[in-house]
């Protein structure tokens, strides 16, 4: 195995290296692990473009940060713009909600998350599904990812569970207003 420390906090592990530093790239041979602070990515063969400060892979991967996970077909880590891009089959999940989209990006300095293409956001409480062509959100340290649509139409459905025996009577419930 090959292990390298990039900058002061990015640890790179691979089974082997191929490439040409004069041409400015190294291929990290699978399995590949990129670990930085609280984030961890497990991937297949990944190209490290030294001049562009980019890691790219077309292989399926899984990433984890605190309680959130991300999977997709390929990724681009652009150190210059502090952005991770999942170009295909993006799936983000955290306790209580999950999001799927054709493409996603996350800026780890601003914590801005953008999902594009057939976006579906599912929440467990309440049982809610929201669909939109694009959603944007913030990755918050205590509240997880909060998504919204930027001025575009969305379609949501919410399912309510019927009252269970022994639950509050209708007269003792708080009124609902919109």
Where are these regions (language model features)?
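Mature-chain termini and adjacent capping regions
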Residues: 1-178
């Amino acid at each position: 195995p090959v292990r390298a420390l990039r900058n002061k906090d990015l640890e790179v592990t691979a089974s082997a290296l191929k490439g040409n530093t004069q041409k400015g790239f190294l291929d990290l041979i699978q399995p590949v692990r990129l670990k930085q602070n609280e984030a961890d990515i497990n991937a297949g063969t990944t190209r490290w473009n030294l001049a562009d400060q980019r890691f790219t892979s077309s292989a399926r991967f899984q990433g984890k940060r605190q309680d959130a996970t991300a999977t997709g077909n390929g990724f681009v880590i652009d150190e210059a713009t502090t952005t991770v891009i999942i170009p295909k089959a993006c799936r983000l999940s955290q306790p209580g909600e999950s999001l799927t989209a054709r493409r996603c990006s996350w800026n780890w300095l601003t914590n801005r998350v953008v999902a594009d293409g057939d976006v579906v956001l599912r929440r467990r409480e309440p049982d809610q599904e929201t669909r939109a062509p694009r959603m944007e959100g913030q990755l918050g340290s205590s509240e997880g990812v909060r998504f919204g649509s930027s001025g575009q139409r969305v379609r949501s459905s919410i399912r309510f569970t019927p009252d269970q025996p022994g639950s509050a009577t209708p007269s003792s419930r708080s009124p609902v207003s919109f």
